[in-house]
From Swiss-Prot:
Subunit structure: Homomultimerizes to form the nucleocapsid. Binds to viral genomic RNA. Interacts with the phosphoprotein P. When in a monomeric RNA-free form, interacts with the phosphoprotein (via N-terminus). Interacts with protein M2-1; this interaction allows the association of nucleocapsid with the matrix protein.
Species assigned in the record: Human metapneumovirus (strain CAN97-83)
Predominant location category: virion
Role according to the record: Encapsidates the viral RNA genome by forming a left-handed helical nucleocapsid that protects the RNA from nucleases. RNA replication depends on the availability of soluble nucleoprotein. The encapsidated genomic RNA is termed the NC and serves as template for transcription and replication.
Subcellular location: Virion; Host cytoplasm
Family classification: Belongs to the paramyxoviruses nucleocapsid family.
Full protein name: Nucleoprotein
InterPro entries associated with the record: Pneumo_ncap (IPR004930)
MF terms (GO), sorted A to Z: RNA binding
Source superkingdom: Viruses
Keywords per UniProt: Capsid protein, Helical capsid protein, Host cytoplasm, Ribonucleoprotein, RNA-binding, Viral nucleoprotein, Virion
A single cellular component GO annotation: viral nucleocapsid
Coiled coil: none
Gene field: N
Length: 394
């Protein structure tokens, strides 16, 4: 593997080719998917809460239910427009309700269940049944004193569910084993408050459901991105919504999901960003910022204007080709040596070779990387840069 052929000058040519396209690609022709109207948001919210509230045997549709909440939040017409804009020709089937007949709710009315296209009715019924059984048991144990925010009907349960989706969304470029392991570890930390409220929430199985869904229904990624941007632009929101936006913007802004070509950013932007992360020359950084301004928030690179170093350090541990370029900081010793581990030996070897060739041609500009003294010392030691020659690289 070699990085020598990647040059920033390729950017304008590649970007021009992409801009000149007069055509769009049609995908998912003949496929169907569920869309839930806003009028059923309360029912979807309750189903999300029931998924979190009890321990279930099967979570395979958990992610689909979370996406259906997004559908109710954006509105069915906007959802269809987002899917069309993403190039998807998938046909939508509106969610409906049906009566279970003999089963009554606590008001003595026929219990209404959701009929969601592609989701087995028996699965929905079993989720509801298990949640009600758990609720009955806990009511007896607590003499009826279950706080509202620990019940399945709590209004923020869909957002908690989607937080797991946002965590797995940042790992779509990883292998499933690495992605799930990292997601579960992070979720146990960032969702600690939610886990106290819903201790039976099965994060590993919910995360697996989201991973599988984003792989099977790629068009849902566009829907997820638009929802995250819409929620992030809202002036008010709950604590759970703020947490979701924070997780989402780390994925959208820090560039981890950009590594999945076609998800957020064009491949040419990935190459450009990676080249700057290696050479970090002021002229090239300026070119990056100019492109960011031109493309606006759609570029997903705006975080670089505020925190260039954070952007570099967040892009080093992903397993595909684009990350070889983006992860060149590991070749400087900032990631691979500074953390004392090598997550990808092939990536590290290529980055090491490239970084040393840049050192020999005096192209590494440490000052524009904004390193801490400890990081800078690690990089200089790794590249054998002496104090006498240090100025050659600054």
């Amino acid at each position: 593997m070699s990085l020598q052929g990647i040059h920033l000058s390729d950017l304008s040519y590649k970007h021009a080719i992409l801009k000149e396209s007069q055509y769009t690609i049609k995908r998912d022709v003949g496929t169907t998917t569920a869309v839930t109207p806003s009028s059923l948001q309360q029912e979807i919210t309750l189903l999300c809460g029931e998924i979190l509230y009890a321990k279930h045997a099967d979570y395979k549709y958990a992610a689909e239910i979370g996406i259906q909440y997004i559908s109710t939040a954006l509105g069915s017409e906007r959802v269809q427009q987002i899917l069309r804009n993403s190039g998807s020709e998938v046909q939508v089937v509106l969610t409906r309700t049906y009566s279970l007949g003999k089963v009554k709710n606590n008001k003595g009315e026929d219990l209404q269940m959701l009929d969601i296209h592609g989701v087995e009715k028996s699965w929905v019924e079993e989720i509801d049944k298990e949640a009600r059984k758990t609720m009955a048991t806990l009511l007896k144990e607590s003499s009826g004193n279950i706080p509202q925010n620990q019940r399945p009907s709590a209004p923020d349960t869909p957002i908690i569910l989607l937080c797991v989706g946002a965590l797995i969304f940042t790992k779509l470029a990883s292998t499933i084993e690495v992605g799930l392991e990292t997601t579960v570890r992070r979720a146990n930390r960032v969702l600690s408050d939610a886990l106290k409220r819903y201790p039976r929430m099965d994060i590993p199985k919910i995360a697996r459901s989201f991973y599988d869904l984003f792989e099977q229904k790629v068009y849902y990624r566009s829907l997820f991105i638009e929802y995250g941007k819409a929620l992030g632009s809202s002036s008010t929101g709950s604590k759970a919504e703020s947490l979701f936006v924070n997780i989402f913007m780390q994925a959208y802004g820090a560039g981890q999901t950009m590594l999945r070509w076609g998800v957020i950013a064009r491949s040419s932007n990935n190459i450009m960003l990676g080249h700057v992360s290696v050479q970090a020359e002021l002229k090239q950084v300026t070119e990056v910022y100019d492109l960011v301004r031109e493309m606006g928030p759609e570029s997903g690179l705006l975080h670089l204007r505020q925190s260039p170093k954070a952007g570099l350090l967040s892009l080093a541990n992903c397993p595909n080709f684009a990350s070889v370029v983006l992860g060149n900081a590991s070749g400087l010793g900032i990631i691979g040596m500074y953390r004392g581990r090598v997550p990808n030996t092939e990536l590290f070897s290529a980055a090491e070779s490239y970084a040393k060739s840049l050192k020999e041609s005096n192209k590494i500009n440490f000052s524009s990387l904004g390193l801490t003294d400890e990081e800078k010392e690690a990089a200089e030691h790794f590249l054998n840069v002496s104090d006498d020659s240090q100025n050659d690289y600054e």
